[in-house]
Structures are given as structure tokens and as C-alpha cells.
Amino acid sequence: MSLFWRGFALIVFTIVSFASVAAERPKIALVLSGGGAKGSAHIGVLKVLEEKRIPIDMVVGTSMGSYVAGLYAMGLSAEEVEQITLNIDWNKGYNDRVSRDALSLRQKQQDELYQLRTDIGISGGTVKSPDGFFRGQAMAALLRDATSNLKVQKSFDELPIPYRAVATDMETVTPFVLDHGSLAKAMQASMSIQGILKPVEWEGRILADGGAVNNMPVDVAKAMGADVVIAVDIGARLRDKSELTSGLAMLDQMTTYMTQVGTERQKALLTDRDILITPAFGNMGIADFDRIPEGVKYGEEAAKRVALSLDALSLSPARYKAYRDQKLSRRAQNSALPAYYIDRVEIVNNSSLADETIRSAMRVKPHKVQTREGLEAGVRRLYALESFDRVTYQIEERGAENVLVVDAHEKNWGPGYLNFQFGFTDDFESSSNYNVGASYTRTNINEWGGEWHNEVSLGTWKHLKTEFYSPLDPSQTYFGQISLGYDKETRRLYLTEEGALRRSRDSGQTYYFDSQYAFWSSEGSLGWNIRPWQRASLGISAMTGDISIDGIGISDVSTSAWGPFLRLEHDTLDSRYFPYSGFLFQGQLGYMRVNQDNGEWATARSRGSSYEVSLVKPWSWERHSLNLMLGAGGTQTNEPLPLFAQDLGGMFNLSGFQPHELSGRYRLFGGLRYIYRLADNDFGAFRLPLFVGGSLEQGGVWDQGHDIRFATSHTAGSLYIGSETFLGPVFLGIGAAEEGREAIYLQIGSTFH
């Protein structure tokens, strides 16, 4: 017989033999139910199945079960699934807030003043809210990472193990079986808990967590052709009478009951050949993701309790090796890659922004290799524009091309958004300040992301502002802005016995008077966003209004000023109030013409340059941070009542003195601030870290440049405890300075100015 025919006969014999072996055993399906963190028990079951050499021919899951099933369907071992799951910070999946380092400089500054980010929308005069407590953006990124962002599948039958996920079609409230597409997106659809995570749009359907309608989809496995079903039930138990103590408990009881009714219907489909595994979890709950190793053990224990039934499905070592080799071969043919050559980029633009603006934020171009890390960074940049409800991407094979599809959905409860402000400070002696306010931002008024931003604040400081801001190109590199505002504040002027502003340690006895500043102001500028966190702007500002000082007969001093300015800003701090990394620089150089007249003086006119610089640089190690703080300012204008006076006083700004207590034409300040993170208090959806620390400060103010010297500056320091909360920063501290000065400070919420 020729060599050709011998080879042909061998191939035919191998195929027939393999088919014969496959035909000798039943097709086994693994069905994994939903149950949050308790889904880790599925991994324990997988471990036992592998130990017993039980082949899985198809895998079906709901909710958390769809996640474990999906990873196993990729051809991963139980140990690999466990390692990936342990490495995931599941709490991050429920935190869609854009981190500070991803925000633009403009967004950071708005957040500092109007820190209560409610995400309330205004559209057509109607108040709207999101359709889910969390957007699912972070969860999508988490699942893409877990699956290595596997390419879109024409059919989940092409995976090493055929796979199905079950979700709820929210329009009909019926089960929907996902059998193709993006694996990560299918998992997310099955896991998006109603009212908690935003539903997933899938080919015209609105899909959410499948647990409510089919938490243990035995019927799906049977429809796929399974001869034997191994089903794992991790569903919640009904509460007993003693636990039904609240309305939420009652609601949870009804939800659990409806889920159990569906599960019982699925159990009724099981035959004598099928195997049901029911882990016991003790007091482990669906949100206990920190107890995943414990859940894995519960799954192993439950699987071992049905060991005799499982043993009947065990293969010989040789046959199991053949099964495993075949699975690994299919995995190699359909595996995720760390980078892809992108032939074409397709933008599915469901927003009012231009396609080019989206492309620019993503920084993706066709005919280039794109890494997964680069694509994820692009998604974060686009989402950080805060115009989008959800931004996703997937890589599709279309013929010989790899097509990157970016799907960007604008928030459907905008395009106007409300945020709020609350701030309170008290020194427990003679001064307390408060402010409440709101901002309204109408976003995307043009296709490049222009905004109409408005602010109102009432309290110690009364503030109104309206501003138009617009990028001048699709990449948002250049911008123009114009604003009009009104401010009225009560400010204390500290005067010496001679009636001069208090400046140095030699000022002698000091008195303070409440002064009223009421001014209209306007500003127009053109700028360059060098980086999202760095910009330069050139413009003109003007202001006009009155100054009055109570107690000394000065009232309605008419004051006006105008002039050009150059402003440079850089902010990469990870936190504005408790920074551990990054760098902050703010600098402005201007030239102002000032007129001042109260009807009794001859009109006082002055002109001159002004400058202002501040810098913060943190260095950190472990839970410690040391911040360098530097500041300087000066003005050459010489109006009788201070308009651009350089001030010191207040916490971390010569602690021990009152705010604005030291005032002059020139200011120098330097300090070191120590921060220790005492507790993280990370609850996933929000954090409430606790800090303690202290500061050492040196600074002074002077009227003449040649008077600036260390001998007339002040030494000060502070000790404090603080936290970052949903209200903003909270500080309680004590400050002390030379001359026996002491002050207690309480600050809650946004700072003033």
C-alpha cells in the first residue's frame, strides 16, 4: 500500500475512533446559577469536576454564574478562573465616578466648588435621573479585563466549550438567551441587577440580570442537547419571621420567592441522570466578595457530597487527556491577544458630539496596532468627558479585517445637569461662615463639547456667575470662554492702632472691621489645553463695584479695574485636599488699571502689574504623605482700599491667624504638611478615608519689596484630623503661631473662593 493511502487510512481511523469515543459517553452540561459573591462556589465545583476527570461539553449560566461559566467556556482551568476572580476588585465594578486624575482641569475646578455631584438631569424643563444607581461603565471594564477582551464571537459554540448566558428582557420580562457576540457584554447583561446597574442594550433589547426569570437555566442546557445536567443552585433562602423587620426585608423576601419559584420549575426538569449540587454558605451573603476563598471551599464541599453520582461520569486518564487536549487546541485557535492590528475604526455615535471629537479622545487610528491597555485608556478618556452614559468597544472580525467598534451613548437624562455646594467654617470664637449653592451646566451646546455654565451661591459669600465655554477644534485643544459674574462678600480687615492694614509681627494692637465688597466682574480669554490637566490662557478681565467698611464711616467707595492677564495652570494631584501624588501649579501675571472714588476724595488712580503663584508637591510612602506648599504674590497698584491685597491667615495658610488677618501688597509663604491615612474605609461605591497630620508654616506680607525679610515673617503650625466625604473635605484642627496666637478650625465641605 502506498504511503499516501496508509496516511489517509490513519486519518480516517482516528476520526472514526474519536467519534466512537465521543458517542460512547453522554453530553454533559454544567448549569451555574446566580447569587453574587456566592457564585465563587462554582469555582469549587469546577475544581472537583476536574479532579474527577469529568468532561464538560457545554456550560450555561445566569448572573454570577454566567461570569464563571464564561471564563470556563474560554478554555481556562478551574485554577485559572479562581486566580482571575481573586485578583478582581469587585467593589470597583460598582464605582463609575471618574477618578480625579482622569478629569480635565476645568472639571476639577468645578468639582472643588460644587462638590455635591448629584447627576440630576434637566431636559426640556423636566427633571430626570439615571436608569440605574450605577452606570455599569466600571463593571464593563472589569469584565473586559477578566476575559482579556476576547473578540466578538459569531456563535458562542465557537468557544472551547459552547456557552450560553441568560438575561431578562426587561420589555417582556422573559428570559433571553445570549448565544453570540461579545463575551464580556453577555456576562454584563446577565449580571446587571435591576435598579442597581444600568441595563445593557443588546440588538434592540434592554437586558438585565437573568436571576429574576431563570436563575438556574436547566431548560437552556437541555435545548442545547445535553444528556446529563450538573446544576449548581446557590440561590438565596427565604428569611424567617425574625428577619422580616423592615420594608426592604419584605421586598427582598418577595424577590427571593419569585426567584425560587423559577428555580423550582427548573429543578422539575432534572431527571434521575442529572445531578443537583446545593452548597451551604452559612452567613455568607451575595455582597461578601472579600470571602471568595471561603465560597470556593463551600463549592468543593458540596460537590464532594455527591461524589458517588459524579464518579459515574468520570473518564479514564487517557480519555480525559484527549478531551482536555481538544479543549486547549480550540482555546489556542480562539484566544484573546494582548494587541490587535486595527484595519478600520467604526464610531457608533449616539451623542451630539462630532465623530472626530470621539476619535480624538480615544486616540485610535486605523492601520495601527492597538494594545488592550491603550484601548482601555482611550475609553477612560472619552468617559471622563462626562457627557456619556456608557462607552464600550469591541473588536470584530469582518472578512479579513479587524474592525474596532466604539459605542458611545450620551446620557439620556441631560443635556443639562445640576450639582450643589455646601460649605461651613467656624473658629469657635468670632468667625463662622457658610455657603449653599447650585450650578447648572448645559453640556454639548455644539459638536465640539461647548458648555453654558451657571453658578449661584448664597450665604456669607453671595455669588452669581454665567459662563460660555467652547473648544475651538474637534480635539478640544484650543478654547475660548467669556463670563459675567457678581460677588458680594463680608470680609474682615484687620487694622493696627495707626489705622494701617495688619501686616507683620511688629503691627502692635490689632482691631478688625467688617467690610462689604460688592462687585460685577467679567472675563474673556483664549486658551490652550496643553494636556487635559494643563492649560495656558490669555485674556482680559474687568470689574466694577463698591467697598464699604463698617464702624469707621467709609461707605460706597466706587472702584473699577481692568487689564490683561496670562494664566498658567497644572494639576495632577490625586486629591486636592489630601494629596499623595501629582503636582499642582497655578500662576497668573496681569497688569491692572484701578480707579477708586468715594465722592469725598479726589479720584485715586493707579496702575501696575500683579502676579500670583501657588504650588503643591506631595511625596508619599506607604500610608504617609509629605506636602510641600509654596505661595507668592504681589501687586504694584496702590489704591487706598485694598482691591488686590495679598492675604495670609487660616488653616494651612499661617495657622493660628484668622483668614485675611495679615494683608499687604506682597506675600511669601512656604510650608510642609504631613498626612497619615489612618483608615481607608473603602465601601466600594464610596470611600470615607480618615487622615491625621500636622503642618509647619512660615510666611509674611509686606508693603514694599525691599521690606521682605525672614525676621518680619511668622512661624506657625497645626495639628488636625480630617476626611474626604460626599460633602467634600472635613477638617477639625488647631493652629498656633508666634505672638501666642491660637485658633481652632472646623471646615465642612467646599472652601470659599
Residue ranges and their predicted role:
Residues 22-62, 70-397, 411-412:
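Patatin-like phospholipase
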Residues 17-20:
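N-terminal signal peptide c-region/cleavage motif recognized by signal peptidases
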